[in-house]
Structures are given as C-alpha cells and as structure tokens.
Amino acid sequence: MAAEADGPLKRLLVPILLPEKCYDQLFVQWDLLHVPCLKILLSKGLGLGIVAGSLLVKLPQVFKILGAKSAEGLSLQSVMLELVALTGTMVYSITNNFPFSSWGEALFLMLQTITICFLVMHYRGQTVKGVAFLACYGLVLLVLLSPLTPLTVVTLLQASNVPAVVVGRLLQAATNYHNGHTGQLSAITVFLLFGGSLARIFTSIQETGDPLMAGTFVVSSLCNGLIAAQLLFYWNAKPPHKQKKAQ
C-alpha cells in the first residue's frame, strides 16, 4: 500500500493539485467525500485550466483584427483599461506571493491585450505611437515589480481594478450601442473571458482568501456578462459598409 501511495499518481498530484495531507485523505484513506480537500482539488484544477486556456483566449480576437486589417468596433480606451486591470492583478499577486494557479492567466492575457492595443493603434495609422506605448508600458511594469515600489502603491493599483474594469467595459458597451453592432469583437474571446472570470470568483476565494481579488472578479464577471449579452443581441448586425456589400 505504501508503494502504491507513493506511486505516479502522487507525483502527479502533489503538490501541483493537492497538499500531501489531502492526497493521503483522498487516496490513502479513501475518504473521497472529504469536502475541504475536494474544494482544494477543484480550485487548483479550475485555476490551472484557466491559466492554460488563457494562452489562447484572446488569439481569436488578434486573428480577427489581422484578418480584417481593421480594429473597427474596438474601444482603445476600453482595451487600455483592461490592460491596467490585468497589470494590477499580476503585480499584486506576485508581490503577495499568491500561487501561480490563482493569477497566472493575468500574465498571458496581459501579453495578448497589449498586442491588441498595438494593433488598434497600428490600424488607425498610429504605428509609431503604438511602439512608444509598448516601450513605456515595459518600463512601468519593471518599476512596479521592483523593490522601489511600496506595497501600498501595489495595493492601490489592485484596488483601482474595479473602476478600471467597470469603466473599460462600459466604454466598450457604449461603443457597441452607438455603432449598433459589435464590429471586430471576437465572440469566442468574450465568452471565454466571461466563463473564466466566473470561475475565478471561486478560485480566488479558495486559494488566496483575498476579498480584493474576489471582489474584482465578481465585478469583472458582471461586466463581461454585459458584453456577452450585447454580442448575442447584435449577433446578426453588421457594419453599414458590409451591409452595402451584401446588397
């Protein structure tokens, strides 16, 4: 039994998905209904799934912009505010030594979001401005992650996530409403973000116990749900120039 307990399954699960005491509880004592350990397993599994999914979640949006050679319908201010929120979550989590499974998607979403920022500027004829923005962002990120930045500043940055998310999503919602369509917004990206933010409410409570993190994801879920609802509402709506081509 001891050899089985220390076998490949244990090496796979401990410590990535379970602490050793929970592994023993579930797979040595076979207490498969041990709720605290099941919650840890579910939270870790969801967290790692979200992180893995985040590698691809915004690529449909990137490819849609590249394919159309246009960022029509995307609010640059909204994308930038989302970048601020992702940066705040990432810096706050690194500073507080939270487990990577509780915030890792912020890193990958940040890289994809800053790519979208640049593409929006590029297709608006502001390529030089876009390059300068990338350089400035990299410099600011280095400063935020350095010992020069006090913890109070990092906490304030995380606290600013809620207004940043709300304002950013409302700007995108207003753009959609004004245009009467969702332009180059990717439905796959929007629905994946909505599902991910919902799951993150549970994982942030379970893995960090931080009310600031959990509150951010509650607000993010509500705002992402608004954009998802607009996508469904405007599903068959097209920009005016595409309507003319269809006619």
Swiss-Prot record:
One of its GO terms (biological process) is protein folding. It is a multi-pass membrane protein. InterPro entries: MannP-dilichol_defect-1 (IPR016817), PQ-loop_rpt (IPR006603). Residues 39-105, 159-216 form the PQ-loop domain. It comes from the Eukaryota. Keywords: Acetylation, Congenital disorder of glycosylation, Disease variant, Membrane, Repeat, Transmembrane, Transmembrane helix, Transport. One of its GO terms (cellular component) is endoplasmic reticulum membrane. The modification N-acetylalanine is found at A2. It is found in: Membrane. The keyword Cell inner membrane does not apply. The chain crosses the membrane at residues 37-57, 74-94, 100-120, 128-145, 151-171, 185-205, 213-233. Its main location: membrane. Belongs to the MPDU1 (TC 2.A.43.3) family. Required for normal utilization of mannose-dolichol phosphate (Dol-P-Man) in the synthesis of N-linked and O-linked oligosaccharides and GPI anchors. It is linked to Congenital disorder of glycosylation 1F: A form of congenital disorder of glycosylation, a multisystem disorder caused by a defect in glycoprotein biosynthesis and characterized by under-glycosylated serum glycoproteins. Congenital disorders of glycosylation result in a wide variety of clinical features, such as defects in the nervous system development, psychomotor retardation, dysmorphic features, hypotonia, coagulation disorders, and immunodeficiency. This is Mannose-P-dolichol utilization defect 1 protein. It comes from Homo sapiens (Human).
